[in-house]
């Protein structure tokens, strides 16, 4: 559920929504959501000073009932 929510959120703020993918991985530190976006959208997703990325992480933590990390990377 979290991966779909993050994907929907990010697809609405990027210029290339078809390049967005979110994969969920479980490890000993909790859940990890790996977000991949087009290189031209990475600045838009991270935001000035990381504000947008922090807002996305805050929304994810509010939706989750466990520890979740969100990693944002570009597709190369």
Regions found by a protein language model. Give the residues of each.
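RNA-contacting regions in translation and RNA-metabolism proteins
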Residues: 1-44, 53-76
């Amino acid at each position: 559920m979290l991966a779909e929510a993050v994907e929907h959120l990010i697809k609405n703020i990027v210029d290339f929504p078809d390049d967005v993918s979110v994969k969920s991985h479980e490890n000993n530190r909790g859940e990890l959501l790996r977000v991949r976006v087009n290189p031209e959208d990475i600045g838009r997703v991270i935001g000035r000073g990381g504000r947008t990325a922090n807002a996305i992480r805050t929304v994810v933590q509010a939706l989750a009932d466990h520890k979740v990390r969100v990693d944002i990377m570009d597709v190369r």
